[in-house]
Amino acid sequence: MAKTIKVTQVRSSIARLPKHKATLRGLGLRRINHTVELIDTPAIRGMINQVSYMVKVEE
């Protein structure tokens, strides 16, 4: 079974770069305190790294 990680949005996407807003949508995050469980892949890790100031990650 693939390893999963939980990603929670902790900061607002208002007044952020459009690229960062798109990254949050790509991760499936819609609002503050919204949590999604994702498969741990290099692509997902790269997306998380890009918006690390807006999300919290639990392994």
UniProtKB/Swiss-Prot annotation:
Q: What Pfam families does the record point to?
A: Ribosomal_L30
Lineage: superkingdom: Bacteria
Gene3D superfamilies in the cross-refs: Ribosomal protein L30, ferredoxin-like fold domain
A biological process (GO) of this protein is: translation
CDD domains registered for this protein in UniProt: Ribosomal_L30
Extract the SUPFAM superfamilies matched here: Ribosomal protein L30p/L7e
The protein's UniProt keywords, in alphabetical order, are: Ribonucleoprotein, Ribosomal protein
Q: Which InterPro entries match?
A: Ribo_uL30_ferredoxin-like_sf (IPR036919), Ribosomal_uL30_bac-type (IPR005996), Ribosomal_uL30_CS (IPR018038), Ribosomal_uL30_ferredoxin-like (IPR016082)
GO CC term, one of those recorded:
cytosolic large ribosomal subunit
Single GO molecular function = structural constituent of ribosome
Write down the PROSITE patterns for this protein, in alphabetical order: RIBOSOMAL_L30
User: What's the subunit arrangement here?
Assistant: Part of the 50S ribosomal subunit.
Q: Which family does it belong to?
A: Belongs to the universal ribosomal protein uL30 family.
Q: What is the designated name of this protein? A: Large ribosomal subunit protein uL30
Write down the species. Histophilus somni (strain 129Pt)
Q: What is the lineage of its organism?
A: Bacteria, Pseudomonadati, Pseudomonadota, Gammaproteobacteria, Pasteurellales
| Gene name as annotated | rpmD
